[in-house]
Amino acid sequence: MALDGFETVRIVSAGGGVTAEFVPDANMVCHSLTHRGDELLHAGRGVRAYAERGKTMGVPLLHPWANRLARRSYSVGDTHVALPEPEGRYGLDPNGLPIHGALPGRLRWAVQEPTAADRTSARLRWDGDELLELFPFVHELRIDAWVGDAGLQLITTLRATGDDAVPVSFGYHPYLQPPGAAPRGDWRVSLGASQRLVLDAQMIPTGLTEPLSPQSFQLGDQSWDDGLAGLASPPEFAVTAGARTLTMTFDEGFDFAQVYAPPGQNFICFEPMTAPTNALISGDGLTVVPPGGEHRTAFSIAVADN
């Protein structure tokens, strides 16, 4: 199948109630997830705008850093990186800070032969000069996706394939769009975290936290763009709207979250993150994988009738 000139990979649950579609040449983004024919993801400006300009949509992978960096340079151990000019390489936020890692159109995944109609796997080698100038740590990523009649599970494994250890700072940015006509103000939200990261004026964590309260609430006219820590076990984030509830569970490997719900938009994002925003600079919460080692993550998006 093709979408905006991109080939897609479609998987279908055994019972036929859930489908998911991925775009290998646009960073393996899951651009569509349906339940009984109803779309659960916000399409944003479409796949081409995502691939070429980093306009996030669907369920995008943010790699090699999730959300923002406080400047255009960082150091990990003895490796010091000065990022090149952003054009065609990575995006900038309104403050001119690097955001969301490499532009998706630069990340083209090799899809593995399918073993069943309800799953797919793909690999990305991070070893070319254009990628290493952003993140000079040779590694491989693997995505394994599976759909059941309750939803989607997505497993991401980073393996350090070079001679150097690899810092892990990726995340995902799922744009959940509850089906039906329930007004945004009536949505009920629950957050599986106990702490909010204190941010500075440029949305960079200061290193301080404050209690998160309440953890369950009606969204109303609230606006969210907040980093969270102190995740529950298991970390579950949910939105109830109309007749269905969408629940994200961070199954493995994600210790931080970002919640994004801008006013006037019919989506909410519960973002699983391996490290907090700016971890490549601050070092806070940063996992480093030794040569030959790996870091595995998993999250699930489930849909249920109320």
Give, region by region, the residue ranges found by the protein language model.
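Acidic, contiguous internal or C-terminal segments within carbohydrate-active enzymes
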Residues: I11-S13, A20-P24, W126-P174
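A short, structured loop/turn motif at beta-sheet edges
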Residues: S75-H80, Q112-S121, W146-G151, G180-R184, ...
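Active-site pocket scaffolds in enzymes
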Residues: T240-N306
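Glycine-rich, pocket-lining loop/helix-strand segments that form or immediately flank
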Residues: E39-T56, A82-R108, R184-P211, F267
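Extended, loop-rich substrate-binding clefts of extracytoplasmic carbohydrate-active enzymes
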Residues: M1-D4, P86-D149
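Beta-strand-rich N-terminal accessory domains
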Residues: M1-R89, S233-F254, G293-A304
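Short, acidic/polar linear motifs in exposed loop/turn regions
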Residues: T161-D163, G180, D305
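Active-site/ligand-binding surface loops and adjacent short beta/alpha elements
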Residues: A165-P167, P174-D251
